[in-house]
């Protein structure tokens, strides 16, 4: 995964009033923290953050270019939490988790399912049982998501975690036997159809 750059400034002041003033100026309060990193209060441009996140999935690698009174420093990070105002849908606060590019970290990677299963046309029910997996890898090896083609799934078929094609550099913590998605037979519907045919 390629890092997306985002400018930030060290925030010297704190408090609700200062946060309100920042938001009126198009900025949002943020914090950077992580192993070996003292928590740093930041401010980032809301529009720049929106641009950095455009088209991104759950995991977004952000290279923060931090200005501390004219002294610049770079920190690779992952957005751990992004608070959004429910009424305006504007960004409210961001948490950045500092990463070391030469050290493996644990991530939750979303699963995207593509295609219309053939089992649906036969009366099966599509059931999503798990939509993400937990992995360990270097930040540069972290995928945006894992795409699974389910168009060939018939009634009774399933996709397990062990069926996923993962890079050798990615280690999955979840059991290979866990079911991600399945096409279940609707026994109740089939039974009703059989009863209807028998009575006709």
From Swiss-Prot:
Where is the segment annotated Disordered? Answer: 1-20
PANTHER family for the chain: RIBOSOMAL PROTEIN L25/GLN-TRNA SYNTHETASE, ANTI-CODON-BINDING DOMAIN-CONTAINING PROTEIN, RIBOSOMAL PROTEIN L25_GLN-TRNA SYNTHETASE, ANTI-CODON-BINDING DOMAIN-CONTAINING PROTEIN
- This chain belongs to the protein called Large ribosomal subunit protein bL25
Q: Which UniProt keywords apply?
A: Ribonucleoprotein, Ribosomal protein, RNA-binding, rRNA-binding
Which GO cellular component term is one of those annotated?
cytosolic large ribosomal subunit
Protein family per UniProt: Belongs to the bacterial ribosomal protein bL25 family. CTC subfamily.
Q: How does it assemble?
A: Part of the 50S ribosomal subunit; part of the 5S rRNA/L5/L18/L25 subcomplex. Contacts the 5S rRNA. Binds to the 5S rRNA independently of L5 and L18.
* Pfam assignment, any one: Ribosomal_TL5_C
Sorted alphabetically, which InterPro entries does this protein's record hold? Answer: Rbsml_bL25/Gln-tRNA_synth_N, Ribosomal_bL25/Gln-tRNA_synth, Ribosomal_bL25_b-dom, Ribosomal_bL25_C, Ribosomal_bL25_long, Ribosomal_L25_dom, Ribosomal_uL5_bac-type
Native source species? Syntrophus aciditrophicus (strain SB)
Q: What does this protein do?
A: This is one of the proteins that binds to the 5S RNA in the ribosome where it forms part of the central protuberance.
Signal peptide position in this chain? none
Q: Which cysteines are joined by disulfide bonds?
A: none
What's a single GO MF annotation on this record? 5S rRNA binding
């Amino acid at each position: 995964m390629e890092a997306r750059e985002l400018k930030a400034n060290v925030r010297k002041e704190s408090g609700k009033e200062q946060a309100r003033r920042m938001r009126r100026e198009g900025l949002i309060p943020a914090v950077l923290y992580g192993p070996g990193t003292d928590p740093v209060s930041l401010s980032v441009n809301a529009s720049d953050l929106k641009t950095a996140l455009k088209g991104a999935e759950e995991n977004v690698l952000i290279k923060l270019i931090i200005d501390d009174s004219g002294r610049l420093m770079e920190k690779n990070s992952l957005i751990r939490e992004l608070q959004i105002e429910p009424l305006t849908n504007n960004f409210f606060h961001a948490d950045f988790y500092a990463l070391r590019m030469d050290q493996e970290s644990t991530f939750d990677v979303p699963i995207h399912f593509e295609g219309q299963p053939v089992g649906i046309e036969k009366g099966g029910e599509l059931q999503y049982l798990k939509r993400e997996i937990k992995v360990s890898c270097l930040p540069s090896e972290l995928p945006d998501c894992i795409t699974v083609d389910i168009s060939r799934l018939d009634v009774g078929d399933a996709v397990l975690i062990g069926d996923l094609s993962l890079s050798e550099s990615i280690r999955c913590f979840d059991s290979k036997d866990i079911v991600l998605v399945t096409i279940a037979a609707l026994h109740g519907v089939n039974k009703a159809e059989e009863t209807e045919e028998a009575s006709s």
